[in-house]
Amino acid sequence: MRNKIPTVLETRHMEVRIDRDTFLDGVQKVQGIAETKGTMPILSHLLLAAEQDRISIQATDLEIGSKGYYSANVITAGEMTLNSKKLFDILRELPREEVHLVKEDNHWVRVKCGKSKFRLPGMPPEDFPPFPEFSQDSLMEFSSKLLKEMIRKTFFAQSPDETRQVLNGLLLERENGKLKMVGTDGHRLAVVRRDLGDTSKGEKLSYLIPKKALAELVKLIEDDEATFSFSAKNNHMAFMQGDQVIVSRKIDGKFPNYQQVIPSDNKLQVKINRNTLQQALKRVALLADEKSKMVRFDIQSGSITLTTDTTELGEAREEIAISYSGEGVSVGLNAKYVLDVLNVIDDEEVILNLKDEKSSCLITSNTDKDYQSIVMPMRL
């Protein structure tokens, strides 16, 4: 475990004053990582460490660690731990004034803000797991806006099955100045490619980032113009932005060869207004089988017809006029999977690239040719 803090700090006890909004912001950024129902009580706590003119706020679940630094009036340096959820709940209700923290004997902590006073039990700071070692040497850099967009366009495609660990995250790849992010659950796939510029050319890099780390990473993104640095060391990778860092274990295992899944011979291109398809599909899917979510897509010259027909729920049908003059084709698709894709495409028009009822549907758009999503077909 961690080294015990110096005796001089123990005898004087940590004391800090910090702006309530600053404190709340720091706790909010890491409290999602703290374990609330784990077998190690210390993991439900945050580690607060004060030195010089700042305080660090740290959380971990042993797989992911997050730490941020915030300006504070440090009267006495030291460390303390407090229950993450209780601290967050208290800070959220406090007035927007200065918060005064004082550590007492046996790890108790007094919290004062305005007329409000609390006395909270802590745990020994030395029991808190050490923060994972990570490299400060950046392997690549990208804007917050780029990172947020790439996660948004692929996050939904990850597998919810915890036993398929290699699919419980996203693949981050850098090759020839391009950054790629890929997600798949075996029934669908989403891949987005973005240009990183000449500065990122170098050896190919490939990392599997866990789902929880990605979700926590998105919480840190406040300024679209800010820059994230990415580094990796041994089994850990780190995302750094300003005074905040998230360190995560890499997922072990081999990600599927996603390039083989992307169809290259889907010659039937059906262009349709994204919002029109989205709204019609939502309506028809109301009567889709609750397990399979299947909707039948019948495409012919001038129209696309969406149909569901189940004995238990009944039938639904909606026809949409389209400017298509190719050969007819029918395919069964999971309505939720298609809607997930439509929710993240920003273009007004989407393209359904089809071949036949036994082949996957490739969904693209004209304005973003570096984003592709594949939905596997279902038996009609």
Where are these regions (language model features)?
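Structural preference for solvent-exposed beta-strand-turn elements
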Residues: M1-L380
